[in-house]
Amino acid sequence: MLIGQIEIRSMKIIDLHCYPNTEPWIKSQGPYVEALAKYWNRAWTAKSEAEVIADLNQAGVEAMLVAFDIETITGAPPCTNEYVAKMRDDHPGVIRQAWAAVDPLKGERAIADAKKAIRDLKLFGFHFHPIMGHFSVDERKFYPLWETINELKVPVMIDVGTTGMGAGMPGGLGAVIRHAHPAAIDQLAADFPDLKIVAAHPGWPWTDEMLAVALHKGNVSWELSGWAPKYFPDAIKRDIKGRLKDKIMFGSDYPSIPYDRIFKEWNELGYSDELMEKIFHGNAERILGLEVQSSCS
């Protein structure tokens, strides 16, 4: 399969947004599993760790694994930081690093978990899912957590836009999509200018607002996972090759959309090989320091 004119397996691909897709991850989603199966129109079931690694190997990606913790809201056991750290250590040729997860609603416990994730487990940074976690990142009560993360000098990846979690269910299972409005990232970026923030997903229905934030805030970059590339809005397609060519990065949201489809549709967007190299690894290496990052750093 080609990306531009480059054989995909000859090009480095850093997948910034990759879930474990094993039983601990499925269980961590609690009541949202049924809604996800309906949203993606397929079974939402776990694979073995060996099967997941085989998927990533076949795709030729260097995965950034994502932990998951929304325990306060759902009571579901987290897909823990220890778990993704072990997967990283067990599969160094496939899993480049891993994003930690802490539940902001846990207060001081979240701060302690954050320190442990970086200092002891040597994880890369933190991922947050505001809709499922029932919080907005610009709420002042969570600022002690952001101050801690800022002091740890690691990046955060924050979901923007609507989600399949709870979609179509009565009341969305209590999830509120405004929690993932790009305006919250705009405020957080302004209040913590040294914090590197990666916005995750295109941000629909607020793609124009997310474009504005990415253009305005120097410490905000953007990965476009969880969305079939052929459905990217025209404004995003233009700015990928224009004003945001040095800020857009690749993520899959595995296991949401098959890698073959994602790569095929990125290829069909018709971008130059030089731009694709930036999107699929160069920007992540430069912005996030991944060219020197390792699991032992």
Kindly label every feature range from the protein language model:
Residues 2, 6-62, 242-249, 257-297:
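Mid-to-C-terminal alpha-helical segments outside catalytic/metal-binding sites
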Residues 18, 65-68, 100-104, 127-130, ...:
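A cross-domain feature marking catalytic cores of carbohydrate-active enzymes
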Residues 62, 71-167, 176:
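Active-site gating/metal-coordination segments in enzymes
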Residues 24-30, 77-78, 111-113, 168-171, ...:
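Short aromatic-enriched loop/helix-cap "lid" or pocket-rim segments at secondary-structure transitions
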Residues 17, 56, 84, 126, ...:
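Conserved, mostly hydrophobic/aromatic
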Residues 51-55, 80-88, 113-117, 141-145, ...:
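A general structural detector for well-ordered alpha-helical segments in enzyme core domains, enriched
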Residues 21-24, 71-73, 104-108, 162-166, ...:
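Active-site environment of divalent metal-dependent phosphoester hydrolases
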Residues 123-125, 138-249, 296:
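Catalytic pocket-lining loop regions of alpha/beta-barrel enzymes
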